[in-house]
Amino acid sequence: MVRTRRIWVTAAAVLALVGGVSGTAAHARPVPAAAESGGKLPPGWRIDEGRSAPQLVWRSARQVPMGDARVEFRADGRLLGVPKPERDGHSFRLGLEAARTGELTDLQVWSGGRRLDTRSAATEAPAAAAGPPAPLPAGPVDPGKPGHYRTTTGEYRLKSVRLPGFSVPVEMSAVVVAPTGVTGPRPLALFLHGRHATCYTPHGDDGQASGAWPCPAGTLPIPSHRGYLRDQRLLASQGYVTVSISANGINGQDWQAEDGGAQARSSLIRLHLGHWADWAQNPRQAPPIVREAPRADLSRVLLIGHSRGGEGVNRAALDSLYPPPAAQDGYHGKVSWHISGTVLIGPTVFGQNPVPDVPSLTVLPGCDGDVSDLQGEMYVDGTRAVSAGKALHSAVYVIGANHNFFNTEWTPGQAQAPAEDDFYDDPDRRDPVCSQGTATRLTADQEHRAGSTYIAAAARLFVAGDDKVRPLLDGSGRRAPSADPARVLSHAVGANRGAGFLPDGKVTVSGGRLCAAADPDPAAACLGEGAEGGSPHFAQWETARESGRNAVALRWTSVGATTRVKVARPVSLKGAEALALRVFVPPNTKGTRLDVAVTDTHGRRATLGRVRVDGLPGSERTASYWARELRVPLSAARRAGVDLSSVKSLEMTGRSSSGKAWLMDAWGWRPGTAAVRAAVLPRVDVGRLRVDEGDSGVRTYHVPVRVSGRGSGQIRLYVVDPATGTAKDRLVTVRPGGRAVDVPVEVRGNTRYGADLSYDVLVKAVHGAVVGSYRGGLTVHDDDPAPEVTVTPLADRVTEGSALKWRISLSKAADTDIGALFVPVPPGGGAPELSTKDVDPQWLADASGAAPDPERPLSKVDGLGLWLDIPAGRTSLDVSVPTVVDRVGEPAESVGFRQTGDDGTPLPDGLLLNGTVLDAS
């Protein structure tokens, strides 16, 4: 039997229908019923009866700015779904037919690792944070210095395009900044902004911005694509042709895309690149600004994406190497370009499937108030062991930077439209790291200058191939003076790193703990309970528990405690200069010291050296548990005769009196960047099949999973139980034409009304494969008509002190709870109305949270909404509402409740429930 979730039904809530019946019938809807303590929804939550299904609605007292991180509804730690935002910026709706069945307890709203539906009580001042670290030594080159070319700027606008899954065409507009006085073709840098409000009212009050598309009359598009002009001018002065493209049409519609719009953004990028490739061959067909610019060299392309734009450029790089399914793609031309690298600024990574063989730089803003879990770290961590590991994947952590100020059109005082600091500053509880004016927080200008410098660094390394800039990006501990006073730290994987110790693989740990990056059990999780803030390395994915994402947790209480990591297969460090470890310690801590040693398969051991690591400045609102790259030379091992071609274990010994640390990985390191060639890999895409339940019989359907490309590889397949929301996973070897990824689903037909049901499937690349569309499944539509609801009065004209009573009946039983919402309306004809002092005060409090005083008609009581709920399998329900004797002589009083629509307003043709209460005297 298929059931929807039960959201709230207590005795008081169920007994919330009042009055008689108009004699009409209405179609009922499935409504979930009970769950929070005492049967009440938490403040801000409600159920709205939709036209096809009920909706779980959360309304924020403060406007939630349109941002890049997804707003997610969770219950008891599991993901329910991604709600649709309302245009008012306050309300979010999730169709309950799409959410998991089972009890809804502990309802919460999350976005980018930050909880939105509650705030920490300001009972005590936050602990002091560490100050900014000392400046690093300057690197051998400074990529932030402008070049010697003059620049020219212009725009182009092409015909809008239709993208799969989006009902409204998307604009093809861009701003170009190019060098002048240049001979020969020049590399191309393409920028894509993130998810921001799309339209604004000129000269309006702050906050008059929306996510509508197309923009309504009287409003203008927000020019988010013009927010990187400073970055474009710097690159253009250094000889790059730059273009920044607009994606408002995607931002206004991506709530309906299962992947958050990643595939649509990839299609848009490649549509622009396709035009640039054509214009390079046929300059006369190009827009004027493109004709004025040097010819673009499409064999040297750098993609720069901010926030969801970062996920878009990652997908575009993937799709350029491994073509996506044609039905889901908006670009069907040739790939006449080569992506040399990507820059991802505060990016989302909902699928956690980065492209492994394209070099990348991920910018992590330490005070990001939007994608606040800094999930973009997965563009580094998620590439390990997937392919050959030759591409450099770097992350730079910018202390004190927020999310928005990398884009001037998202920066107050610089933007045309309303803009704000995304790191919300609570005046009653200022953050010691990220509140404006603290020693660590950057100004908008300082932040943007740092961003420009590191974008230019990536261009110089990935496109121009200048290895002198690498120490700024690969954990070598060098800085670019142009980014001062920003403190920018880096670590990396790939490039000339060799084999290493990877906790995700087959390892055993003694003296420490092999911990899970994502696990609801605090004893298994790496951070567990008590951590102040979060870790980008442990950003949560779609499932509460994941397999194969691990780290090594160290904790010691005396000098000399040792943690040993032993690998199943010996590691070769031959040819490496140093062992590079990525280690983090708790924020704001100083002077953690560790001795590092290795042992070979013959038992020869050598202590390589001692490292010291300090924590980043952090607070409970930051993701500051981020790994620093620490290097120890291998010279001591060579002197000790250790066979570096066959190392079996790594040891870390605490030399502080006590401490905690986490090891992400360790690699053989030598300088330089290797030549990168994309491997031939199979690509996996999960689709979604939608079927009708049918009236009888059992049908077996298979979740559509497409494997394309060549070769074979491994993925991890997660199948989510629709009843519990928990996921089971298994490793699967995939190859084109194979049937290893087979998820059968049995659908049993019947003629009873029920809820739609989704069987979700998720995939992640593990080794030798890439993943495009990471989520899909089977959605079963219940195709049976809803039963009719009628109301029979049992006592609809009573003396005060008695209860009004009715029987709610269905024309036939359903396989789901059936409910409807009613709101009070004034009686017709000006009749006296039942007031707050005419009903039982406890019933009033349970039904609405209101008190009787001041006395007012029930139709004036905020939040008074009356639910009926008939449990699955039953056909009737008796309900009542208690009245009280008020000892005040008065005429007969009436009350009326009208059935509501999606928005909670009464339906003109909905059921009308009337009742009359007579004076007892």
Enumerate the language-model features and the residues they cover:
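Secretory targeting and sorting signals
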Residues: 1-28
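Alpha/beta-hydrolase-fold serine-hydrolase catalytic core, especially in secreted/extracellular enzymes
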Residues: 29-50, 65-67, 72-79, 85-88, ...
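Alpha/beta-hydrolase active-site loop
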Residues: 226-231, 258-298, 303, 317, ...
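Active-site-adjacent alpha-helix of alpha/beta-hydrolase-fold enzymes
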Residues: 358-435
